[in-house]
């Protein structure tokens, strides 16, 4: 029974991924109209930020299931497959729907934007497709213990999950305007998807020693994340993600 604990945690990851999808797909979008500018927009209620919360919880559980599996010597092929299936949902599909909703809001701001083709929104689902490919490649690759090939899907999912929090809690007009620009989101889709499917070496966030050379990349990422969190709030998440990518390329 003890050896099933990691699998139960993995399924809990999947559960919160499903909760994130529910929060991101919630109905109740509001059509607004600015009488001063004549601009129309779709405003999605603030509760979409719960999708970000559920993805964050899924990420914590995703870390714990691997830790518990190693602790109890309960690693198994079943656990490996369950982990990948759960990650596709929690860090691929759920973030993809968040992007879909932001694209919908961005395009609705244009003249006749509410009548725009759904085709403009479909690129959002490149993210879960790229994540699934990355996980499939990881499952058959035996060389990704200390160094990953491409950004792991949880990191990609977390950075996308941070954008609703940035949008609703930054109180910065410039940031909000950027997040309501469809071309910004097309850029996010391209960059995040590419980073997942590429074979660039990325640091596996696992401690394998206590010497400075091993710890330095982790210290840099943690320092940037903490300082950024104090200065710019939730914007610290994409900044930490960018730091992770840069540090991985420098400390190969």
Residue ranges and their predicted role:
Residues 1-14, 48, 68-88, 135-155, ...:
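Interhelical loop and helix-boundary elements at the membrane-water interface
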Residues 18-26, 92-102, 159-166:
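Membrane-interfacial alpha-helical segments at the cytosolic side of multi-pass membrane proteins
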Residues 1-63, 240:
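Topogenic membrane-insertion module of multi-pass membrane proteins
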Residues 145-252:
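C-terminal membrane-associated helical module and adjoining short loops/tails
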Residues 45-46, 53, 71-134:
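Multi-pass membrane catalytic core of lipid/isoprenoid biosynthesis enzymes
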Residues 1, 44-50, 75, 111-120, ...:
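Short juxtamembrane and helix-loop transition motifs at transmembrane-helix boundaries
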Residues 50-60, 115-129, 179-191:
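Structural signature of hydrophobic alpha-helical transmembrane segments
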Residues 32-38, 106-113, 170-179, 204-206:
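Membrane-interface helix termini and inter-helical loops of multi-pass transporters
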């Amino acid at each position: 029974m003890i050896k099933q604990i990691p699998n139960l945690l993995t399924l809990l990851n999947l559960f919160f991924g499903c909760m994130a999808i529910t929060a991101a797909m919630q109905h109740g979008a509001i059509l607004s109209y600015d009488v001063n500018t004549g601009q129309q927009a779709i405003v999605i209620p603030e509760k979409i930020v719960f999708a970000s919360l559920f993805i964050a919880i899924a990420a914590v559980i995703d870390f714990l299931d691997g830790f518990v599996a190693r602790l109890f010597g309960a690693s198994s092929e079943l656990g490996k497959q369950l982990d990948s299936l759960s990650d596709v949902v929690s860090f691929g599909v759920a973030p993809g729907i968040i992007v879909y909703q932001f694209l919908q809001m961005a395009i609705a701001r244009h003249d006749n934007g509410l009548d725009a083709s759904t085709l403009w929104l479909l690129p959002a689902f490149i993210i879960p497709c790229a994540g699934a490919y990355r996980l499939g490649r990881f499952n058959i690759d035996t060389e990704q213990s200390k160094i990953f090939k491409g950004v792991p899907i949880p990191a990609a999912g977390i950075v996308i999950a941070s954008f609703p929090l940035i949008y609703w809690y930054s109180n910065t007009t410039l940031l909000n305007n950027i997040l309501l620009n469809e071309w910004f989101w097309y850029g996010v889709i391209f960059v995040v998807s590419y980073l997942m499917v590429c074979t660039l070496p990325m640091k596996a966030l696992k401690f394998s020693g206590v010497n400075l050379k091993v710890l330095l990349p982790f210290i840099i990422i943690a320092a940037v994340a903490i300082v950024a969190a104090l200065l710019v709030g939730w914007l610290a998440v994409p900044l930490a993600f960018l730091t992770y990518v840069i540090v991985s390329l420098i400390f190969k």
